[in-house]
Amino acid sequence: MSKRQPLYYLVAMLVIGAFFAGQVIAETEFADLESSLDDEELLFGDIPSVFSASKYEQKVTEAPARISIVTADEIQRYGHRTLMDVLNTLPGFQTSYDRNYSYTGARGFGVPGDFNTRILMLVDGHRINENIFDGVVPDRGFVVDIDLIDRVEVVRGPASSLYGSSAFFGVINVITKRGRDLQGAEVSVATGSQESYQGRISYGERFDNGFEMLLSASGYDSEGDDRLYYPEFDDPASNNGIAENVDDANNRNLYAKLSYGDFTLSGVYEEYEKGVPTASYETLFNDSRTRTWEGRVYLDLKYQLTWSTILVQSS
């Protein structure tokens, strides 16, 4: 027997072991999906459906991915006010905040300052990642008010074969409400600490001829923390490291969704402004002129035709 044969056997055993270990892990993750639903729900209840995993609607127990679904009822029950609050409650996600943007990582990995470029964010299937850094910030500056979210579908793992770039850690698809979910007008007003104020007015309706509409306008203003201490700037020339009244934030958002038959027209106008107290990018410390501003406008026309229960064509 050649001396190299035991080495070949060892390599072969390692390869076979890795293959079966991968199968066990995959089967375990799939089993976790089913175990999250109790036996009575599997037998008698409605098993949730998901679209994002394969780009057609299927039961979560049939989807080839690890999926979490957060509904509007859960968002209201737990008092989430931003999409970042939702992600912070999900297993495998971690979030951080640098007084300018919020960041999220997955599976213990998150590069500071990468603007969440490894997660693909969708709103009703429309790509939200911007075209400069390919990033997205799911906090107060998100394009849709959280009260207009019907559910959030979170698909873990790479999905670049379906969605292209950014879908490395996962895909987050925000499904918005429809006119039938409101059936009239809604007015919401809230206030909180740090002189924070938030308001929203929405109108939704589904008419007898099948036409459906949802219109909404919302705004948010906050003064933030009035005094923040940074030891790195503890010097008389830098106000002894104290940033005063430079942590404010405000957001304005308009959203419209019209649908008739297989056609859906949706549009967004959003602008977000944030004071930056950390003097990032070598700017002046404790200077109210240091600000971040971003805006987004998009109009999306979608035609969706369902040929069968597993074949959906969208354009």
Walk through the language-model features, giving the residues of each.
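N-terminal Sec signal peptide and the immediately downstream disordered periplasmic leader
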Residues: 2-5, 9-10, 15-78, 84-88, ...
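Extracytoplasmic beta-strand/coil segments of soluble accessory domains associated
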Residues: 47, 52, 59, 84-127
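N-terminal periplasmic accessory domains that precede
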Residues: 83-86, 104-108, 119-124, 139-142, ...
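Transmembrane beta-barrel domains of outer membrane proteins
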Residues: 86, 155, 175, 200-204, ...
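Membrane-embedded beta-strand positions in outer-membrane beta-barrel channels/transporters
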Residues: 103-105, 151, 171, 186-188, ...
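Short acidic/polar hinge/loop motifs at secondary-structure boundaries
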Residues: 127-156
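Periplasmic-side early beta-strands and strand-to-turn transitions of outer-membrane beta-barrels
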Residues: 161, 181-182, 190, 202-290
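Face-selective signature of the C-terminal outer-membrane beta-barrel domain
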Residues: 257-273, 293-315
